[in-house]
Amino acid sequence: MIISLLHLNLNAQVFNFTSEEEGKSITHKVLLDSEYFIETQYVTDSNEFISTRGGFYELKEGMYLVRFEFNSNFSSDSLKTLNYKSTKWKQSKALKQDHSGKWLMAGRVRNGVEKRRTTSGARKTLKFLLDGHFQWTAFNTETFKFHGSGGGTYTAQEGDYIETITYFSRDNSRVGAVLPFRYDLKGMDWHHQGMNSKGKPMYEIWTKRVN
């Protein structure tokens, strides 16, 4: 299968385009850096989540071969790879922020006690941040089981990190919610504190992905 892209600069970028399916306008949002690619689809009018898929890619003969780490529709389409080439997408305005890059959930702090978890196993939670846009996805690289995803826009400045939810696979009623957090960058780690989408306190530790 081949899906279109045109003249993608290998710097971190965010793209959007729309398609029509069964009379509905579908928004496709693409997060792309020099090695990793995510495409997410949601209904344009309601922001209802449809699907997401992503993974590392390589450029071969003008085509982007994406080898998926996750595919929310894997149980129905069994896709593990996809080729992208040649068409024009609309690039979002670049808004450089702290945190840009790929992060893996590395642990939590509860009652003042830090508990780490491995980031090298098959079960991962990835957060991809580019140009003021974010997406987190929970998945298993071995079984392709999809555990959920959400994304939108964010700002990060002087310890304040604020997310605005555009799509959320688990609960569409959370679309539009604004979630304020505090952050602290410590070496390769991002300490992330506040209230989660259910209004419960959380303290997460994310670590910069290096592979």
Regions found by a protein language model. Give the residues of each.
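Lipid interaction determinants
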Residues: L8-S149, I162-N211
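Beta-propeller blade signature
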Residues: G151-A156
